[in-house]
Design a protein with these regions (language model features):
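Helix-loop junctions on the outward
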Residues: 51-74, 115-121
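Hydrophobic alpha-helical transmembrane segments of multi-pass membrane proteins
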Residues: 18, 40-58, 175-185
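Membrane-interface helix caps and helix-loop-helix hairpins in membrane proteins
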Residues: 67, 95-96, 118-131, 138
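C-terminal transmembrane-bundle signature of multipass membrane proteins
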Residues: 143-146, 167-234
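Internal transmembrane alpha-helix with an interfacial aromatic "cap," most often the third helix
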Residues: 23-27, 59, 74-114, 118
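Membrane-interfacial loop-to-transmembrane alpha-helix junctions, especially the N-terminal start
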Residues: 35-44, 98-103, 165-168
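Hydrophobic transmembrane alpha-helical segments in integral membrane proteins
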Residues: 1-19
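Alpha-helical transmembrane segments in multipass membrane proteins, preferentially the mid-helix core
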Residues: 21-25, 87, 116, 136-160, ...
Length: 234
């Protein structure tokens, strides 16, 4: 039974419900999108749907054991974080030609970031593993701010795609900065499981749902523009 005074447990519950609501919203709103944007909204719904399932399990682990649901959390991230980079690829592919190499660079970097974090949180060289995870994240930031992904976005010529891309890159830079803070507060003998889980939970709440909202905004905006253009030329 969830104790109303258990801050960590309450955050697990709130975020479970929020992820379910977001999944329903993105699924329903998919009908308003056209073309490749439908796929983008489907992936956004997959991200929050997968997260909702894992958050219900993580809440149960926390309530029953009082311990951090480490494995469930990283399984969730290993599924949802690569999907978020699929979103980056789909945004670019919606308006221009994108190389498969860009997709794999982002995918491999995101998986490396997570694997280093998991190994560190399991207690094996937590500080070096944490630093390696941060370096993988920094590479991702380089790619989306100054690398191939950034250049492809600048040349796309699609206003909705460019707006979404610019918003998402700031989520990955500012929003994702919360995760290393939680990691370094939680590892080591003085680490706090409560602080780590509250920080991770709030970060997931902001980053997963905000990611999807950005996609939804771009999808509905671009779809409305295309519909208006079609009516004007009819």
């Amino acid at each position: 039974m969830l104790d109303p005074n258990d801050l960590v447990g309450v955050t697990f519950w709130i975020i479970s419900a929020a992820m379910v609501a977001a999944t329903y919203f993105f699924t329903v709103e998919r009908d308003r999108a056209v073309g490749k944007w439908k796929t983008s909204l489907t992936v956004a719904a997959m991200v929050t749907g997968i997260a909702a399932i894992h958050y219900f399990y993580m809440r149960g682990v926390w309530i029953e054991t009082g311990q951090s649901p480490l494995v469930f959390r990283y399984v969730d991230w290993l599924l949802t974080v690569p999907l978020q980079f699929v979103e980056f690829y789909l945004i670019l592919a919606a308006s221009t030609v994108v190389s498969a190499g860009l997709f794999w660079k982002l995918m491999i970097a995101s998986i490396a970031m997570l694997m280093f974090g998991f190994i560190g949180e399991m207690g094996y060289m937590p500080l070096p593993m944490g630093i390696l995870g941060v370096l993988a994240w920094v590479y991702i930031l380089y790619e989306i701010f100054a690398g191939e992904a950034s250049k492809v976005n600048a040349a796309s010529g699609n206003a909705a795609s460019q707006t979404a891309y610019n918003a998402l890159k700031w989520i990955v830079s500012v929003g994702w900065a919360i995760y290393p803070i939680g990691y370094f507060l939680g590892v080591g003998e003085s680490g706090s499981a409560e602080a780590l889980n509250v920080i991770y939970n709030l970060a997931d709440f902001v980053n997963k749902i905000a990611f999807g909202v950005v996609i939804w905004s771009a999808a509905t905006s671009d779809s409305a523009t295309q519909a208006s253009s079609s009516q004007a030329t009819a």
